Each structure stands twice: as C-alpha cells, then as structure tokens.
C-alpha cells in the first residue's frame, strides 16, 4: 500500500501488542461518559425541532441553521463513539479489525469522508449562526424577510462547501495506522499539496474571525437596548465566548498537523487533545443553545421551573421581538 502522506510517515503500521490496554480502555470509558449524554441531547433537540414542534422552530432561520449544526455534531459523535474511538482505545480489537480496515478500503474511506465532511460543515454553520444573530440586531424589521430569501442559499452553501475540504480524501486511498495500541485512519493524499488538515484549519480560522467580528457588533448594538436585557447580553457573551474558545482550541490543534514539523514523541498527545477539543465543541454546542433559549430549554426539559418567563429575554431573536 502506498503511504505517501505526512500523516502516515509519523504513525506505524500494524497493531502495537506491547501497549497496556487498561489505560486506553479507561480513556474510552471516560469519553463514553460525556458522549452518550451529548448524543441523547442532540437527538432530543432534533426531535423537537424537526418533528414535535416543527411549526415553531422550522419557520425561524436561526433554528434551521442550528438544526444542521446539531446533525453534524450528532453524526461525528456517533462515528466517534461506535467506530473511531473503539478502534483507537480498545487495543484488544486491533488484531481482528486492523486487517478488515486494511483490505476493505471502501468502508474506511466512506467513514473518513463523512466524518471530515461534518467537521468542515460545522465551521461554515458557525459563520451563518453568528451572521444570523448580527442581522437580527442590525435590521430587526427586515430580519425575517432577509433570511426567508437567504435561507435556501445558506442551506445549499453549508451542504456543498465542505466538499472543498474533503475532495482529495474522496479520491485518495484510506488506510489504518497504529496509535494508542489501536489504530486510526489516514489517507494517501493523491494530490500532494491538498492537505485535509490545512483545509480544515483554513475553514475554522475564517469561521473564528467572522464569529468574533459579528458577535462584537451584536453585543455593541445590544447595549442600546433596555436594562432588562442585560442578563441576555451576558448569556450571549458567554455563548459567544464558549463557541469562539472551542473553535480556537480545535483550530490550534488542527494547525499542528497542517503546518508544523511533527515528531512521534508529541503526536499521540496532540492527537488526543485534538479529539477532546472537538468533543467539547460537539457536546457543548447543544448545552449552550439550551442555556440561551428559554423556549428550547422548556421543550427539552418540560417542567414548569424551566418555562420561559415573559420578562426574560434569552435569545437575540426574542430580544428583537420583545422590544
């Protein structure tokens, strides 16, 4: 098998039978502890938005975009929990699964492509979420009209633009490489200069820049609203800070594989931290949204204490509607 990618030059072939499986199994159990609740929350949110309360959420552009983000996060979490993290952190399965992933190349290529497609999509989705909030504050009277015409273009752009990131993965060969006693997936880079890590990092850097810019404008404009909206401003500030910090940390680790000289001594650690950074993003995004939107919080947890109060503004959209 031709292994001409820089990624494959760092990792070794085959299973490392000298690795102690217990610490790796504990890593998987730890990740299982927060991934399962994350998957459940995403399923709950999507069932509410797409089915139970579709007439409420699917007429609002912000929640249409967020539902796409939730689908992307959910897909990544499912692939991580049942495939990616299993083959990495359960070394006992490596001797059986490694040959299958090595010889049946179509399956790992599909998994690898879908996973990185969703990762790229999240960067684009983040841009539209923050632009949507900014538009709501800058043009409250024309906000709904603008996004009613713009949302089909938004959906198409979110759907198609990730192919700019993964096109080289699709046409290249995917293969297993050893890591943490198990193995992960790499690709040969048929087009040598088209690095997946570089494309991913570029997308995330653009997303982070636009997020900071649009959120700053949104917060500046919100300061002119009534004092009763100060709690909403603090909530939005927290949400924006969280999303920006999560994207920044993920982009930082992405840049390690994209641009810096990498050695085996540090690659395992950075690979682990990179996965954790994306976990924070995928698991944290629905939690942040539930904290922001009182209506969504009440639908997710239908108890009276969670019901939104009329005097409390919990989202940018509701801020404009109540002023």
UniProtKB/Swiss-Prot annotation:
InterPro entries: 7TM_GPCR_serpentine_rcpt_Srg, Nematode_SR-like. One of its GO terms (molecular function) is transmembrane signaling receptor activity. Keywords: Membrane, Transmembrane, Transmembrane helix. GO terms for cellular component: membrane. The keyword Transmembrane helix applies. Its main location: membrane. It is found in: Membrane. It comes from the Eukaryota. The chain crosses the membrane at residues 31-51, 63-83, 98-117, 151-171, 193-213, 245-265, 272-292. Belongs to the nematode receptor-like protein srg family. It is a multi-pass membrane protein. This is Serpentine receptor class gamma-5. GO terms for biological process: sensory perception of chemical stimulus.
């Amino acid at each position: 098998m031709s292994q001409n990618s820089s990624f494959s030059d760092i990792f070794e072939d085959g299973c490392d039978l000298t690795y102690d499986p217990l610490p790796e199994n504990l890593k998987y159990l730890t990740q299982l502890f927060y991934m399962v609740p994350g998957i459940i929350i995403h399923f709950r949110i999507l069932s509410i938005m797409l089915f139970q309360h579709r007439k409420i959420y699917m007429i609002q552009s912000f929640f249409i975009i967020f539902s796409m983000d939730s689908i992307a996060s959910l897909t990544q979490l499912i692939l991580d929990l049942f495939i990616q993290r299993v083959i990495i952190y359960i070394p006992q399965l490596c001797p059986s699964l490694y040959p299958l992933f090595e010889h049946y190349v179509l399956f790992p290529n599909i998994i690898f492509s879908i996973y990185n497609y969703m990762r790229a999509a999240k960067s684009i989705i983040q841009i539209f979420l923050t632009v949507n909030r900014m538009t709501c504050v800058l043009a409250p009277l024309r906000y709904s009209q603008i996004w009613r015409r713009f949302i089909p273009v938004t959906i198409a752009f979110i759907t198609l633009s990730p192919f700019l990131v993964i096109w080289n993965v699709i046409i290249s060969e995917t293969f297993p490489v050893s890591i943490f006693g198990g193995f992960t997936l790499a690709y040969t880079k048929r087009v040598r200069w088209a690095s997946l890590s570089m494309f991913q990092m570029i997308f995330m850097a653009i997303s982070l820049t636009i997020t900071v810019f649009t959120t700053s404008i949104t917060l500046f404009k919100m300061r002119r609203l009534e004092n009763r909206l100060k709690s909403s401003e603090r909530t939005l500030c927290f949400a924006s800070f969280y999303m920006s910090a999560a994207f920044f940390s993920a982009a930082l680790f992405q840049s390690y594989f994209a641009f810096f000289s990498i050695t085996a001594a540090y690659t395992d650690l950075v690979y682990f931290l990179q996965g954790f950074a994306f976990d924070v993003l995928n698991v944290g995004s629905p939690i942040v949204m539930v904290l922001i939107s009182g209506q969504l919080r009440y639908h997710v947890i239908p108890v009276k204490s969670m019901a939104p109060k009329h005097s409390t503004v919990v989202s940018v959209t509701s801020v404009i509607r109540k002023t």
